[in-house]
């Protein structure tokens, strides 16, 4: 995996998220099933019984109870008549101007935002630990066992967080599938971040982690070389450390080459979906629902 391509995907994902969470909500005037929230319509009835008698004298009792209609994602309806009429037209729900109560249907709210927050915290901790260790080594102090253990834990947590974020987004989509099959805007946002976390996890395990481990080994060799009194042996260790730090890990194979081109091609995804949602918001074309 090539670093710059992954970084471009990450930048595009952040930009697209800002667009979806800010401009997109402002752009949409229609609160039908294309908005970022999730609600369902629930008719508010009092429980009543109506008794009727047919021609044969049979008495029939009809009980009217509160009825929940199928999920109808909207932004914030809150009993607004215009909003509920749009929901009625899209989903075929007949509310007939009865009182409407809107309640959330999502089991997991904003999985993409949760993922961004968790990954950001873990990356921040990882960067702080690495910078602290590098500064410690540059100052002439050896890295302690605790520091190396802490770096190892953060390396493991970073990969686990990236891989777990993909699983979390998939589970959230499955859990709220009735909502996401109608609200493609939120679905697109979640799928996009799941894709980004996936390529970050692959890039991390195949490129970033080996490179970082190699750099740390090179720095440790330099520190050890300074403690060796034999000048020739110390020089050899410094040369080895320099080579270890700068030589490529391995020549890219066929899989890496194909993956690089596919990731480059996938960069077109971000402008394509942005143009699509702008067109939907401005009413230039109907959403795909």
From Swiss-Prot:
<feature type="transmembrane region" description="Helical">
    <location>
        <begin position="112"/>
        <end position="132"/>
    </location>
</feature>
<feature type="transmembrane region" description="Helical">
    <location>
        <begin position="189"/>
        <end position="209"/>
    </location>
</feature>
<keyword id="KW-0472">Membrane</keyword>
<dbReference type="GO" id="GO:0016020">
    <property type="term" value="C:membrane"/>
</dbReference>
<keyword id="KW-0812">Transmembrane</keyword>
<feature type="transmembrane region" description="Helical">
    <location>
        <begin position="151"/>
        <end position="171"/>
    </location>
</feature>
<protein>
    <recommendedName>
        <fullName>Putative transmembrane protein ORF111</fullName>
    </recommendedName>
</protein>
<feature type="transmembrane region" description="Helical">
    <location>
        <begin position="1"/>
        <end position="21"/>
    </location>
</feature>
<keyword id="KW-1043">Host membrane</keyword>
<feature type="transmembrane region" description="Helical">
    <location>
        <begin position="261"/>
        <end position="281"/>
    </location>
</feature>
<dbReference type="GO" id="GO:0033644">
    <property type="term" value="C:host cell membrane"/>
</dbReference>
<keyword id="KW-1133">Transmembrane helix</keyword>
């Amino acid at each position: 995996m090539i670093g710059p391509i992954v970084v471009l995907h990450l930048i595009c994902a952040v930009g697209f998220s800002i667009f979806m969470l800010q401009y997109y909500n402002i752009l949409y005037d229609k609160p039908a099933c294309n908005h970022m929230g999730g609600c369902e319509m629930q008719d508010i009835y009092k429980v009543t019984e109506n008794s009727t008698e047919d021609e044969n004298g049979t008495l029939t009792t009809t009980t009217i109870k509160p009825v929940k209609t199928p999920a109808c994602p909207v932004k914030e309806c809150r009993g607004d008549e215009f909003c509920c009429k749009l929901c009625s037209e899209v989903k075929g729900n007949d509310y007939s101007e009865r009182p409407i109560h809107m309640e959330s249907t999502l089991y997991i709210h904003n999985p993409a935002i949760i993922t961004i927050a968790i990954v950001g915290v873990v990356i921040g901790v990882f960067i702080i630990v690495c910078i602290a260790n590098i500064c410690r080594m540059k100052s002439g102090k050896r890295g302690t066992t605790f520091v190396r253990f802490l770096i190892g834990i953060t390396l493991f947590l970073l990969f686990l967080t990236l891989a777990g974020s993909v699983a979390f987004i998939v589970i959230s989509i499955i859990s709220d599938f009735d909502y996401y099959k109608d609200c493609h805007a939120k679905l697109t946002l979640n799928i996009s971040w799941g894709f980004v976390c996936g390529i970050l996890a692959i890039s991390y395990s195949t490129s970033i982690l080996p490179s970082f481990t190699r750099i740390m080994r090179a720095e440790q060799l330099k520190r050890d070389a300074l403690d060796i009194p034999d000048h020739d042996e110390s020089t050899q260790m410094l040369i080895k450390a320099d080579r270890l730090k700068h030589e490529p890990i391995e020549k890219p194979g066929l899989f890496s080459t194909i993956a690089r081109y596919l990731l480059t091609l996938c960069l077109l995804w971000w402008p394509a979906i942005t143009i699509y949602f702008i067109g939907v918001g401005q009413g230039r074309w109907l959403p795909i629902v």
